[in-house]
A protein has these predicted regions:
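Acidic, histidine-bearing metal-coordination/catalytic regions of metal-dependent phosphoesterases
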Residues: 1-57, 68, 313-333
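Acidic/histidine-rich helix-loop elements
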Residues: 27-34, 61-74, 97-102, 126-130, ...
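Beta-strand-turn-beta hairpins that frame and shape the catalytic cleft
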Residues: 38, 46-59, 143-144, 150-163, ...
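Active-site neighborhood of phospho(di)ester-bond hydrolases with catalytic His/Asp-centered motifs
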Residues: 59-62, 89-95, 117-124, 146-149, ...
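Core catalytic region of metal-dependent phosphoesterases/phosphodiesterases
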Residues: 67-154
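Solvent-exposed loop/turn segments at secondary-structure junctions
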Residues: 96-98, 124-128, 151-153, 167-170, ...
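Binuclear metal-dependent hydrolase catalytic cores centered on His/Asp/Glu-rich metal-binding motifs
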Residues: 136-143, 149, 155-200, 204, ...
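Conserved beta-sheet core of the metallophosphoesterase superfamily
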Residues: 140, 195-280, 289
């Protein structure tokens, strides 16, 4: 299967081959500004893990895109913020570079800065840039890269299975290989750069999938992300938490989280509330909403009704949208 054309080919030739600007992206001021541009979102659950785990903290980052398009300070700040959360495990769901091998040493330096164990899968940009080279850079930085495989890691005296599905966008995902030999008696979490692969993983009793690729639209003004990523690109899962349909009698519902990512591609900008750079922290083993400081940002997980706070926020959003529409209509009269 041939790989789809890279969107980076729309850029001027060899943009990613140019050296980075001379500005000191590691200065205290640059890092402070970068930290302010990254949102840390926190979630508790899914509920299924409460019977299998005694409290683990997982950090999820995606689409780091080390290279010229994303400032180095942004990536340093992302690692710094992640370490401050003191996760038990860091999971990275692909697109580490941006159509170039020029910055692989910098990628190695970056992932080496994580304090916790790190596991990863590759994305489409990694294949367009040279999957073997990207994989080796990650491994030199201490990252365990899963390619259609799963592994078991001991954390806080308990075992967690991690499934890593290779990139589906470039045709490298082999789900059957990834789940072969999974133990049903152990809690399992999966990584896939493309969120739509979660449908097949749920069917194999993998309850929770982390993914990326969409950048949450990257530019989310006036609903452009829903048009570009959803309708035009054909993605059912654009950003945030989505639940599965049940697969047969007695099957447990699953969930997939689509991260907004850290870096950018094609354009060096991210605009709109939903397009902000993001780190997601998951507290496994807790009931959703059980941790007070997580309650506001906790979406309704599959099989659970929305909280009163969520209902109020949704109602307020509907009213705000209607008022904006009415205001716009009044100006055109």
């Amino acid at each position: 299967m041939s790989s789809p054309p890279s969107p980076e080919r729309l850029l001027p030739p060899n943009l990613e081959q140019l050296p980075l600007p001379e500005e000191d992206w590691t200065s205290a001021r640059a890092l402070l500004r970068a930290r302010q541009r990254i949102q840390v979102r926190r979630f508790a659950g899914p509920a299924r893990y409460t019977e299998q785990l005694s409290h683990l903290r997982i950090a999820h980052l995606t689409d780091i895109h080390v290279g010229r398009v994303t400032p180095w300070a942004i990536q340093l700040a992302a690692v710094e913020l992640t370490n401050e959360e003191k996760p038990d495990l860091v999971l990275l769901t692909g697109d580490f570079v941006c159509h170039s091998q020029r910055y692989l040493d910098r990628l190695e330096e970056l992932v080496r800065r994580f304090d916790a164990p790190v596991m990863a899968v590759l994305g489409n940009h990694d294949y367009w840039s040279g999957a073997d080279e990207v994989r080796m850079a990650l491994q030199r930085g201490g990252v365990e890269v899963l390619s259609n495989a799963h592994t078991t890691i001991g954390l806080r005296h308990q075992m967690l299975q991690v499934v890593g599905l290779d990139d589906a966008y470039t045709g490298h995902a082999r789900r059957e290989d990834a789940v072969k030999g999974l133990r049903r008696d152990l809690p399992t979490i999966a990584m896939s750069h493309i969120a739509e692969e979660a449908d097949g993983l749920w069917a194999h009793d993998v309850p929770f999938v982390l993914s990326g690729h969409t950048h949450a639209g990257q530019v989310t003004l006036a609903g452009l992300h829903e048009l570009a990523i959803g309708k035009l690109a054909g993605h059912r899962y654009v950003h945030g938490l989505y639940g599965s349909r049940r697969h047969g009698e007695g099957a447990e519902p699953g969930a997939v989280y689509v991260g907004a990512g850290i870096g950018a591609s094609v354009m060096p900008i991210r605009l709109g509330d939903r397009g902000q750079r993001e780190i997601a922290i998951f507290e496994l083993g807790y009931e959703p909403g059980a941790i007070e400081e997580h309650h506001e940002e906790q979406p309704a997980l599959p099989g659970r009704p929305p909280t009163e706070l969520q209902k109020q926020k949704r109602a307020a959003a509907v009213v705000e949208k209607r008022m904006r529409r009415e205001l716009k209509a009044s100006k055109t009269r």
